[in-house]
Amino acid sequence: KVDKFQGDNRLEVHRIAGDGNGADDFGFGTIKFKDFGIQLDFYLLEDPFPTKIEILFRASIDLFFYQLIVNPVNGAGKKNIARWYKREGEDRGTWTEYIEHRAELPIPVETKAWYTLSILGRGSNFELYIKRKEEASSKKVCAWRDPKNLHPGGVMGIHTNQLQHYHIDNVKIYDKPTEVELNVESHEKLAAIWAN
């Protein structure tokens, strides 16, 4: 089974078979959106190897979607990095990475720790933020634009394949990206004047 809810209502994503392209390797939500904010907590496991998380957005069950993959610092392949993909239907050959939008994560993302991930979408513009769950402020990972706006609307989803095992909790989907609470710290200090 791809996923199951734990007693504490966390979603456990665990796939022990499959090639990553079958119907059981994808999970799709039901609420469609255009502009959006997605915020969720995630916890990567080591079972038996460090895993990654794969989130789909503006997705459809016909396999049209954008995809975010976050690899941990102790994972296989590209380490401590966010990668963006797109897919345009059943043809697996259309599942390609936006290599120019790869971004190193501003904090070390490790297995066996909780993180909060936020994806914002306004038209064809996207932003990614991350923080350790216990931290007050998110850090911006990157911003990018799809000039073709391949997928103007869809649902949230997940993708998994062999050896992926992680938990998701506190999933929130907002109609407006500005509703997501990021508490991002400014890189510039502002002067304040107090009046009597």
Pin down the residues of each PLM region.
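Surface-exposed loop/edge segments in extracytoplasmic proteins
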Residues: L63-F65, R92-Y98, E134-A143
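Short tryptophan-centered beta-strand motifs in secreted/extracellular beta-sheet-rich domains
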Residues: I38-L40, K112-I130
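Short, solvent-exposed beta-strand-to-loop segments that form ligand-recognition rims
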Residues: Y129-V155
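Beta-strand-rich interaction surfaces with strong enrichment in secreted/lumenal proteins
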Residues: D24-I31, R102-V109, G157-I158
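Secretory/extracellular carbohydrate-interaction modules
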Residues: R15-R92
